UniProtKB/Swiss-Prot annotation:
GO terms for cellular component: cytosolic large ribosomal subunit. Pfam families: Ribosomal_L1 (PF00687). Component of the large ribosomal subunit (LSU). Mature ribosomes consist of a small (40S) and a large (60S) subunit. The 40S subunit contains about 32 different proteins and 1 molecule of RNA (18S). The 60S subunit contains 45 different proteins and 3 molecules of RNA (25S, 5.8S and 5S). uL1 forms part of the L1 stalk. SUPFAM superfamilies: Ribosomal protein L1. Keywords: Cytoplasm, Ribonucleoprotein, Ribosomal protein. It is found in: Cytoplasm. It comes from Candida albicans (strain SC5314 / ATCC MYA-2876) (Yeast). This is Large ribosomal subunit protein uL1. Its main location: cytoplasm. Belongs to the universal ribosomal protein uL1 family. Component of the ribosome, a large ribonucleoprotein complex responsible for the synthesis of proteins in the cell. The small ribosomal subunit (SSU) binds messenger RNAs (mRNAs) and translates the encoded message by selecting cognate aminoacyl-transfer RNA (tRNA) molecules. The large subunit (LSU) contains the ribosomal catalytic site termed the peptidyl transferase center (PTC), which catalyzes the formation of peptide bonds, thereby polymerizing the amino acids delivered by tRNAs into a polypeptide chain. One of its GO terms (molecular function) is structural constituent of ribosome. InterPro entries: eL8/uL1-like, Ribosomal_uL1, Ribosomal_uL1-like, Ribosomal_uL1/biogenesis, Ribosomal_uL1_3-a/b-sand, Ribosomal_uL1_CS.
């Protein structure tokens, strides 16, 4: 049973959007984040959960993606205007930790041709996995544009050592209804990952990049 109602969330979304679109409009597209504070959870002892959820709409349209591809996928990526790297490009990084870290920082997510996915750890070491950015596989039969959209629409909840986490659930250009729906979906999905569900939730807050926080739970 959800402890948040769409009317309660809507009220806060309304205030958040009003602030970002009228009170203090920024000259870039602000992301809306769901910030979660957990309680009665011990990251050392309890299971560190992780889960992914595909939202109906892309939270961050300007999210950057790079494709590690064979010749076929590198060509497809170029025709879509998406950055791509071939196996040779990856070999040129020569397992240099600094360069691989730089690559992991430069992009929000990665996609790799199915045929290459097994080679990624050998070529790049554990850096991408540690950053929570291990590539999503794509096959030649998949529509690459849809795959890119899927990756952009998917949010990831991952508990590390601290009891707070934040995920992008939308942006301030979205319709109120859409944003409310995305927040509700994300919050309820997160709660389903927790050992004691709502008893582990200390607080839920929504916030745009530069705006104030609004508590929804």
């Amino acid at each position: 049973m959800s402890k948040i109602t769409s009317s309660g969330v809507r009220e806060n979304v309304h205030k958040l959007l009003e602030y970002s679109t009228e009170t203090k409009k920024r000259n870039f597209l602000e992301t809306v984040e769901l910030q979660v504070g957990l309680k009665n959870y011990d990251p050392q002892r309890d299971k560190r959960f992780s889960g992914t959820l595909k939202l109906p709409q892309v939270p961050r349209p300007n999210m950057t993606i790079c494709i590690f591809g064979d010749a076929f996928d590198v060509d497809r990526a170029k025709s879509l205007g998406v950055d791509a790297m071939s196996v040779d490009d990856l070999k040129k990084l020569n397992k240099n930790k600094k360069l691989i870290k730089k690559l992991a920082k430069k992009y929000n997510a990665f996609i790799a041709s199915e045929v290459l996915i097994k080679q990624i750890p050998r070529l790049l070491g554990p850096t991408l996995s540690k950053a929570g950015k291990f590539p999503t596989p794509v096959s030649h039969n998949d529509d690459l544009y849809s795959k890119v959209t899927d990756v952009k629409s998917t949010i990831k909840f991952q508990l590390k050592k601290v009891l707070c986490l934040a995920v992008a659930v939308g942006n301030v250009d979205m319709e109120e209804d859409v944003l409310v729906n995305q927040i509700m979906m994300a919050a309820n999905f997160l709660v389903s990952l927790l050992k004691k569900n709502w008893q582990n939730v200390g607080s839920l807050v929504i916030k745009s990049t530069m705006g104030p926080s609004f508590r929804i739970y």
